[in-house]
A protein has these predicted regions:
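Short N-terminal micro-motifs specific to bacterial/archaeal maturation
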Residues: 10-11, 53, 124, 152
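Short metal-coordination and nucleic-acid-contact micro-motifs, chiefly zinc-binding Cys/His arrays
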Residues: 1-3, 16, 55-58, 72, ...
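Short Cys/His-rich zinc-binding micro-motifs
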Residues: 4-13
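N-terminal juxtadomain amphipathic helix
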Residues: 13-120
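Conserved Radical SAM active-site core
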Residues: 78-174
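Short, exposed beta-strand "edge-strand" segments with a Pro/Gly-rich flavor and a Y/T-containing core
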Residues: 12-19, 150-156
Length: 174
């Protein structure tokens, strides 16, 4: 139990936020600084920019519309301004990504999507996780992508990833 930093109510509160759900919903302007600080802290830990940059070369690849300063990276961590030009640090010839096999049925695929229920094992899913994201969900179950973004590794080409598919790979989830 924690005490809300806004209303003082004592209840179950996310430690990183310090404010209760009621205040986030009913007093958003007061809660916003706490939420923003938590987001910044979650990115700072991995050496990522804390918010989309606003001064520099404009990147239009996502909703963040970063303006990336010379020698810096955008919010995603895989676009950089080098000598006044936007450069892809990953994603063209090789993506920052990890993969693994997940036996079907798996929690990332609705049961009706795969025939594992009909044909059973050894069918599997090829689960692919990209090492960059334009969101910053505080409690993302796949938070470790931030480490991949920081180090721009591991990298894998489309051909290498495609080679992981075999006769028992029923689907691919990203």
């Amino acid at each position: 139990m924690m005490r809300c930093k806004i209303c003082g109510k004592q209840e179950i509160i996310a430690k990183e936020l310090g404010v209760c759900a009621d205040c986030i919903k009913q007093r958003p302007e007061e809660a916003k600084p706490f939420v923003i600080q938590a987001h910044r802290k979650s990115r700072r830990r991995f050496g990522l920019v804390e918010e989309p940059p606003k001064k520099g070369v404009e990147c239009k690849l996502c909703v963040n519309n970063c303006r990336i300063p010379e020698g810096e990276k955008g919010y995603c961590g895989v676009r950089a301004n080098i000598n006044g030009r936007l450069i892809n640090l990953a994603g063209t010839s090789k993506a920052v990504a990890e993969w693994y096999y997940d036996a079907l049925p798996t929690n990332c695929v609705a049961s009706w999507c795969c025939s594992a229920l009909d044909k059973s094992y050894p069918l599997k899913n090829l689960a692919v996780f990209y090492g960059a994201c334009t969101f910053n969900c505080l409690y993302c179950q796949n938070w470790s992508f931030k480490e991949n973004t920081l180090f721009l590794a591991p990298k894998i080409s489309a051909e290498e990833l495609a080679s992981k598919v075999d006769e028992n790979t029923y689907c691919i989830c990203y």
